């Protein structure tokens, strides 16, 4: 297959017109379409120069989505690392979030466990695992479960 620079640019612009992507993610998607690595590198550089591609903007967008879906800080970090976003960019995206992760964990626990926090060991462990899976750390989980218990 013979792909030229214009075709690769067009593919990149179509992808970026739908939503933000990380540099790595855009590179992978263009490679899946069969574009040569040299051409992809040139196109990524081109869209970066135009400001169409930004890991910082992508990280901020992902952070808003994660918070809106009720996931925690750990989950956000994990997802951004999977997309090969730089650690500094992740830290910046987290710093821009004005969310109280403790209160978010409490809201998620309250929404999921309407019947209240269980004092039975196996059920309590299940609730802790659920909040861990959602990306909350142990301090946030402890706060959420204790706060939910005192709300009852």
Swiss-Prot record:
GO terms for cellular component: cytoplasm. GO terms for biological process: regulation of DNA repair. Keywords: Cytoplasm. InterPro entries: RecX_HTH_1st (IPR053926), RecX_HTH_2nd (IPR053924), RecX_HTH_3rd (IPR053925), Regulatory_RecX (IPR003783), WH-like_DNA-bd_sf (IPR036388). Gene3D superfamilies: Winged helix-like DNA-binding domain superfamily/Winged helix DNA-binding domain. Pfam families: RecX_HTH1, RecX_HTH2, RecX_HTH3. It is found in: Cytoplasm. Signal peptide: none annotated. Its main location: cytoplasm. Belongs to the RecX family. NCBIfam families: PRK00117.3-3. Modulates RecA activity. This is Regulatory protein RecX. The gene is recX.
